[in-house]
């Protein structure tokens, strides 16, 4: 037998790629994500997400509830940005009812939508940084996040699942002192953001882990159906607050930050700059907010005040009927969407003329973003998968529903 010739008795086989599970118990999975990774050494060849571990049948449950009873389900979808989802649902019901929300209520809704955006981006940026190895931003910004939770609690009584934005307006007006406290927060939080930027923006390790990782071109972003930060990070200036304004956004002056490289670092910067813009929007709203009603003056849609119920039998009856039977919505169908912190959150409602929705389809931005995890991770190291999951800012409440 020649020197370099392989013996016919030796069996040769090609080395297969190594397959491993990532999650669902992994701390960097941000919930119940199960990834099946196909690895070629340290490089990712395929990432297959397995979802459904947090499925609760929300859309079906809503069909068995009145329009008011269905509202709290929306807080429990993306449980990091609660009021944004209530907002989309309320807009859809108001379209079907053809009712106009009072201007003060619109300003309050915008203030709380932007506070929710900050609430979400604080969690997104700090947990992303912590996944990569930076603990300090988490400790700094969660102190600020606690203040935002207090603002939630002061208007609704709940720190997370507020059920504050309701069809026809908001649950109650600002309590005494809240206006001043939000204004003070806006002034102080600006400088805390500056400190976080000083810590991360030029940090060598942070940039090594994020720059040129998870690049998505503008064409890819559109074909995947991206929205929100994931779309703007690829250089497309699309924001529903500008492109399809709702409430009082058309009366406000603010900028839309967009990226140019479509990588994780660009998306991090956009989230930080969006927090600056949210502070600017909140300040404008607090200054321009007029006095007036905070819910539609129609007792068939919104409940009467507690003080009225003590003296008026009619108000008591309205209140009882509203919470026991709800209100009938004219037979029709509509789609309403808001620029939620994670992207376009939409609600498609079909009414059959009864007091319960015939169908309620929820469009969650995170579902579309997670689909692209395979293409974004391909060719990267296994450690970069953690960075990409962090930059997608996914929450499984809305993905699994």
UniProtKB/Swiss-Prot annotation:
Transmembrane segments: none annotated. PROSITE patterns: COMPLEX1_49K. GO terms for molecular function: NAD binding; NADH dehydrogenase (ubiquinone) activity; quinone binding. Its EC number is 7.1.1.2. It is found in: Mitochondrion. It catalyses: a ubiquinone + NADH + 5 H(+)(in) = a ubiquinol + NAD(+) + 4 H(+)(out). Keywords: Electron transport, Mitochondrion, NAD, Oxidoreductase, Respiratory chain, Translocase, Transport, Ubiquinone. One of its GO terms (biological process) is mitochondrial electron transport, NADH to ubiquinone. It is an enzyme of class 7 (translocase). GO terms for cellular component: mitochondrion. Core subunit of the mitochondrial membrane respiratory chain NADH dehydrogenase (Complex I) that is believed to belong to the minimal assembly required for catalysis. Complex I functions in the transfer of electrons from NADH to the respiratory chain. The immediate electron acceptor for the enzyme is believed to be ubiquinone. Component of the iron-sulfur (IP) fragment of the enzyme. NCBIfam families: NuoD, PRK06075.1. HAMAP family: NDH1_NuoD. Belongs to the complex I 49 kDa subunit family. This is NADH-ubiquinone oxidoreductase 49 kDa subunit. It comes from Acanthamoeba castellanii. The gene is NAD7.
């Amino acid at each position: 037998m020649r020197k370099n010739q392989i013996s016919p008795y030796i069996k040769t086989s090609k080395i297969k790629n190594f397959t491993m599970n990532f999650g669902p118990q992994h701390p960097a999975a941000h919930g119940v994500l199960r990834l099946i990774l196909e690895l070629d050494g340290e490089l990712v060849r395929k990432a297959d997400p397995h979802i459904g571990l947090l499925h609760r049948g929300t859309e079906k449950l809503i069909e068995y509830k009145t329009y008011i009873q269905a509202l709290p389900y929306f807080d429990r979808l993306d449980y990091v940005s609660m009021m944004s989802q209530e907002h989309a649902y309320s807009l859809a019901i108001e379209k079907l009812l053809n009712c106009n929300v009072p201007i003060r209520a619109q300003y309050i809704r915008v203030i709380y939508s932007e506070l929710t955006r900050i609430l979400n981006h604080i969690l997104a940026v700090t947990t992303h940084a912590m996944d990569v190895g930076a603990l300090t931003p988490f400790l700094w910004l969660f102190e600020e996040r606690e203040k935002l939770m207090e603002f939630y609690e002061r208007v609704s009584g709940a720190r997370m699942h507020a059920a504050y934005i309701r069809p026809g307006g908001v649950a109650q007006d600002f309590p005494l002192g809240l206006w001043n406290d939000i204004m003070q927060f806006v002034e102080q939080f600006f400088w805390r953001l500056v400190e976080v930027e000083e810590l991360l923006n030029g940090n060598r390790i942070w940039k090594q882990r994020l720059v040129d990782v998870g690049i998505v071109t503008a064409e890819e972003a559109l074909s995947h159906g991206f929205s929100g930060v994931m779309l703007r990070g690829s250089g497309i200036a699309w924001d529903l607050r500008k492109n399809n304004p709702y409430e009082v956004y058309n009366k406000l002056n603010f900028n839309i930050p967009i990226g140019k490289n479509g990588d994780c670092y660009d998306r991090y910067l956009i989230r930080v700059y969006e927090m600056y813009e949210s502070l600017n929007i909140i300040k404008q709203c607090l200054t321009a907010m007029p006095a007036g009603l905070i819910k539609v003056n129609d007792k068939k849609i919104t409940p009467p005040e507690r003080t009225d119920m003590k003296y008026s039998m009619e108000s008591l009856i309205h209140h009882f009927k509203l919470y026991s039977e709800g209100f009938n919505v004219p037979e029709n169908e509509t789609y309403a969407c808001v620029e939620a912190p994670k992207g376009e959150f939409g609600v498609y409602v079909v009414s059959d003329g009864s007091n319960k929705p015939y169908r309620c389809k929820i469009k969650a931005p995170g579902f579309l973003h997670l689909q692209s995890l395979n293409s974004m991770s391909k060719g990267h190291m296994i450690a970069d998968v953690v960075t990409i999951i962090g930059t997608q800012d996914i929450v499984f409440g809305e993905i699994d529903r």
